[in-house]
Amino acid sequence: MSPEIPRLLRTGMHGAVATGVMSVVFAVARRRGAMPGKTPPRRIVAAVWPTAPRRSHAALAVALHLGIGVGAAIGYRIMFRGAAGSPISAAARGIAHGLATWAVGYCVVVPATGALSVAPRDRRDRQGMLLLAHAVYGATLGLLEHHVAERAGRR
């Protein structure tokens, strides 16, 4: 087995953790009224699979969101493998990656599903929270990857 496989799996786990942290931002935003209605993953499930039983929408949305977070993290690993620097530079790389993930998702992919409008035409409060949440995702991912690389002595 390639030595890169365990590293990619670890990065995938970091993506799942970062997605969980991002979901806390969503939960706080929803409690404060900044994200009314269904979450974007639930909207995507409803748009892409309208015949899915309603009771399964929540589980499908969680699986979708985790899958995207894991996949985006692996993309991060491929782009920034071996990048050196401080925790601040790792967080900055992560934030840039998180915002790029938001741009691809909310300016191209999600609108293509019919779940939401293109980001500039969507609600500003929702897109502001989505930007913040994706920045948090990226910072978390970047710091996790940096921490593990430092501990392993591989930068």
Place the predicted regions along the sequence by residue:
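Short amphipathic, positively biased membrane-proximal segments
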Residues: 1-155
